[in-house]
């Protein structure tokens, strides 16, 4: 995977209790969650088309959104490459998160695709089990 150009987000990490942040933008751990490089705008467009039914046939989307329990409280139920996050205000967000050194991301939106959000945090080690939930709650309470 290559990060093209220079106008892109940068990823940072702290290692072994060091106080100094290290730029790890170009490190590659060799796992699948670092294999897709995109822009927030493209991720929002993708989820808008997916969740509005413009990308897949109705039956395919229905199957994708059919979930099974994961046993992981932060994720809840998981479909085919997508999971539902139920916010405290009752809004359900469908999307997916990923992480690689220096980056934690989430992209998704509401069914119908009218409201989507892509989030990037510069660092993948957080003390919060779901670092996106408060951001999602703020955005999807509007």
Tell me what each language-model feature is.
Residues 18-142:
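Catalytic loop of the DD-peptidase/beta-lactamase superfamily, centered on the K-T-G motif
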Residues 1-11, 15:
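Active-site helix/loop module of the DD-peptidase/beta-lactamase fold
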């Amino acid at each position: 995977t290559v990060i093209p150009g220079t106008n892109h987000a940068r990823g940072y990490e702290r290692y072994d209790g060091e106080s100094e942040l290290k730029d790890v933008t170009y490190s590659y751990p060799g796992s699948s969650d670092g294999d897709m490089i995109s822009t927030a705008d493209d991720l929002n467009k993708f989820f808008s088309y997916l969740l509005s039914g413009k990308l897949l046939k109705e039956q395919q989307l229905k199957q994708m959104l059919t979930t099974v329990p994961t046993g992981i409280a932060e994720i809840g139920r998981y479909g085919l490459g997508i999971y539902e996050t139920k916010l405290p205000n009752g809004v359900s967000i469908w999307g997916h998160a990923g992480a690689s050194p220096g980056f934690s991301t989430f992209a998704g939106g509401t069914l119908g695709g009218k409201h989507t959000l892509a989030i990037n945090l510069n660092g993948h080690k957080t003390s919060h089990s779901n670092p996106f939930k408060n951001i999602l709650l703020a955005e999807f309470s509007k």
